[in-house]
A protein has these predicted regions:
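Divalent metal-cofactor coordination and adjacent catalytic microenvironments
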Residues: 1-209
């Protein structure tokens, strides 16, 4: 049971990509204002897909992952006898196993906070261009620590629902919200604003090394 993602790795132990926020959680964020709106579920999926695609990995929740690569892959680099692998995640909580050419590696490795895995003491005989490398690891923000991401998605969905209805501003309980004019008329849940992207900065993959 696994799901192959569009970001180059596999989630194991699940048969669908887990949602980042449930419909009930969205209703809690919005005080059930849209509880009977049939667009909520599809807009949530659209918004969370936009977040994940912008960040370059599944972001949340924490999940068992597997990356299959080779020494030829752009996410792999070799310096002297040290192997560096850029895991497609910025929050990796643990490494389960590292297998090189079918043999599990049990020597020294270091996991960096930015998702770079450094593997030391490799034999030069292992370092052939197409040698298979498989890393099993756990990555993602735990569901109970992802309120900031959930709130961002909830806001993105709310903007989509309100702008599609032609609402440009509203006031409730002394709080006034003005919707970005660029989102009015045909706004979608996938349109991440600049302030959304700022919030997502810590979760976005920065590229290789």
């Amino acid at each position: 049971m696994s799901v192959t993602t569009t970001w180059g790795y596999t989630l194991t132990g699940v048969n669908t990509l887990p949602d980042m926020i449930t419909t009930q959680e969205f209703n809690n964020f919005t005080a059930n204002k849209y509880a009977n709106d049939g667009r909520v579920s599809s807009d949530i999926k659209a918004a969370q897909s936009a977040v994940r695609n912008y960040c370059g990995w599944h972001v949340s929740p924490s999940a068992a992952c597997e990356l299959s690569t080779t020494f030829f892959d752009k996410c792999v680099s070799v310096v002297d006898r040290m192997l560096m692998i850029q895991l497609p995640a910025t929050f990796v909580s643990s490494i389960t196993s590292i297998t090189i050419d079918g043999v599990e590696y049990d020597e020294t490795y270091v996991l960096m906070p930015n998702g770079i895995l450094r593997v030391y003491g490799l034999s030069w005989s292992h370092m052939k261009m197409w040698t298979p490398i498989v890393v099993k690891y756990t990555a993602g923000i735990p569901d109970n620590a992802a309120d900031g991401i959930k709130e961002l998605i909830a806001h993105r969905v709310t903007h989509a629902l309100e702008s599609s209805a032609g609402v440009q501003s509203e006031t409730a309980g002394g709080v006034s919200i003005t919707y970005n004019a660029a989102w009015i008329n045909g706004s979608r849940a996938t349109a991440l604003a600049d302030d959304n992207k700022e919030v997502l900065t810590p979760y976005r993959l920065r590229g290789v090394f």
